[in-house]
Amino acid sequence: KPHFRNMIKQRGGMFAKGFLFGTQFTAYLQDELWLTMARHAVTQAQRIQTAAVQKGYRLFAVSPTNQVFPILTKTQIQSLQTDFTFELTAPVDESRDAVRFVTSWATPDEAVEALLQTL
């Protein structure tokens, strides 16, 4: 039908993207929910970053955010890939790569502990 999409919108069957995103942001900003969620993510990442340095790992970049960039050997990377999800960021040399771990509001302490025990 011609103008079918417009008819759906006019009758409330399809929300505008701006309305939906605005509703999400209203919820995030209420009672500083976004800050609480971000604080948890950054705290978890800092735990990983601090432990990695204490264990002797070099960092590709020091990050104050919810991302951690340790440099690992290719063997370590292969071993970690069986139990953890992360991104290969950049090759450092023939035997080592920088990887990126990202934490979120939903990253549990148990997941961080498991990673730290494996590193």
Place the predicted regions along the sequence by residue.
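Active-site C-terminal subdomain of aminotransferase-like
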Residues: K1-Q67
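Conserved C-terminal alpha-helix-loop-beta "cap" of PLP-dependent enzymes
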Residues: Q46-R47, A51-L119
